[in-house]
Amino acid sequence: MKKIVVTILAVICIAAVCGGFYYVTQKDKNSEEVILTEVQKVNTKNIDTDYPETPREVVKLFNRMIMCYYKEEYTQSELATLTEQARKLMDDELLKQNTKENYLAAVKADVAEYKELNKTVSQSSVGDSNSVQYIKDKEDELAYVNASYFIKTGNEFSRTYEKFVLRKNDEGQWKILDFYQVEGDSSEDEE
């Protein structure tokens, strides 16, 4: 009697293992792996609930968007969503200067000019955490972050440097207040 019970339990265990293996292998065959483009990854990022914590991270995300503008393929709808995502990183003061329509039109015009001149932004980098400068100006907390961009024009490369000014808002989020071109030092750059 004992042998029969052990044999039945062994058969049940083997059947369960085989059934589990079959289920797992069939599940993988049936599920299609969806590969998102960089534009789709940025556009589906929930910035409202997963906002970057540091000024450097804000600029890194903004740079991902810049790389999408100048380097990736996208539809006009995806570009509109991308510019909306970028505006979520901007301070209210900068948003007033860049309405939704104006910012989208400016990006379209700049991208068209780059294409006409056979220019692309081939790489971007942000200064390391130690190079971020924090300043208190009256009630405002400001941060200055350096970034650089490799620009490819035909077969030639050049490097452009920008300084981003970010301000901490009432929710504790760092928002881009301004950015402008500066003379730079490549030794401060880090991906």
Task: Place the predicted regions along the sequence by residue.
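Short beta-strand edge/turn micro-motifs at domain boundaries
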Residues: D28-T37, F157-E191
